[in-house]
Amino acid sequence: MEHIGFFPPHDGVSLRALAEHLGAELADEAFAGVIIKSIAPVYRAGDGDVCYLLSRKNRAELETCKASAIICLPTLSSLVPEHIPVLLSKKPHTDFALAGALLHPQAMRPVALTSTPTLISPTAFVDPTAKLEADVGVEPGAVVGPGAEIGEGTRIGAGAIIGPGVKIGRHCTIGGGASVLCSYLGNGVIIHNGARIGQDGFGYAPSPRGMIKIVQIGRVIIQDNVEIGANTTIDRGTMDDTVIGEGTKIDNQVQIGHNVRIGRYCAIVSQVGIAGSAVIGDGVQIGGHTGINGHIQIGDGVQIGAMSGVMNSIPAGERFAGIPARPLWDFLREAAEVAKRSGAREKKDGSAEHD
């Protein structure tokens, strides 16, 4: 089947201009005028495409590669066929991401559902007391509640709900069907389709008559340039705030409980659950399907492996994995020992069957 993308190619950027934009080195100036229009993987890259190379594993694909340029480490440039221009980079993955943003800026935000995303649809409802700055787009079926404030260049997707008094900064995108209640958002925030921000936290007091609801009167504070994936849920605080720090990226289907405080530039992969009042430091990376206990602290720069169960606080800079989570090398040694013993047992059982 022919590959037809939803994001049309760029009009074209010269390889010299792309190298300057990335701060990369063009290996051969004879290729300075080559025009780059899009990005693609090595195996599918064709005329006008740029791809990137991280290791020797793609060596076989390079033999048939038809890309117009390849971004790679200087130590790997000898693997690239002579007819393909090379951009030498110390950080090819990052530079490839920057190239994608340059060539496909429209893909940096959730897809607009109308051809006039900077206008207010006649089928949207915007309360008369709401304040919208210039160039705010509100797509069909969206609701902007009383007293809400929305900054310049922000787009509210179809069917989205912006609650009373919510403040949203400039150049944000709220995806279709998302809801934002009891929240303050900074600038450049992206919330993908179906996310739920600022609903009740899960708070109940046990009693002889059953569970008594604890009112949740806090807020959600989302700082600048945060991105929140589809169908992720972030509860508002009980009395204090739930806070997501600047530049943090949260994948799809993540649950963040009330009063959680997440630092800056964290990466949280899909299906992570963070229980109430946990404190996550700056630059933390959490693998998918991990559970974080409430009322614990995760230090700056911690890395947590996928499908871990974090019961206790973790000091800064550590790498943890497993259930319960423990230092990575302890987990790997234990896993190797279990595998070794299991293999020995299977070998013994097999020998017994042949006797």
Swiss-Prot record:
Pathway: Bacterial outer membrane biogenesis; LPS lipid A biosynthesis. The active site is at residue 258. One of its GO terms (biological process) is lipid A biosynthetic process. Coiled coil: none annotated. Pfam families: Hexapep (PF00132), LpxD (PF04613). It is an enzyme of class 2 (transferase). InterPro entries: Hexapep, Hexapep_transf_CS, LpxD, Trimer_LpxA-like_sf, UDP_GlcNAc_AcTrfase_non-rep. It catalyses: a UDP-3-O-[(3R)-3-hydroxyacyl]-alpha-D-glucosamine + a (3R)-hydroxyacyl-[ACP] = a UDP-2-N,3-O-bis[(3R)-3-hydroxyacyl]-alpha-D-glucosamine + holo-[ACP] + H(+). It comes from the Bacteria. One of its GO terms (molecular function) is N-acyltransferase activity. Belongs to the transferase hexapeptide repeat family. LpxD subfamily. PANTHER family: UDP-3-O-ACYLGLUCOSAMINE N-ACYLTRANSFERASE, UDP-3-O-ACYLGLUCOSAMINE N-ACYLTRANSFERASE 1, MITOCHONDRIAL-RELATED. Homotrimer. This is UDP-3-O-acylglucosamine N-acyltransferase.
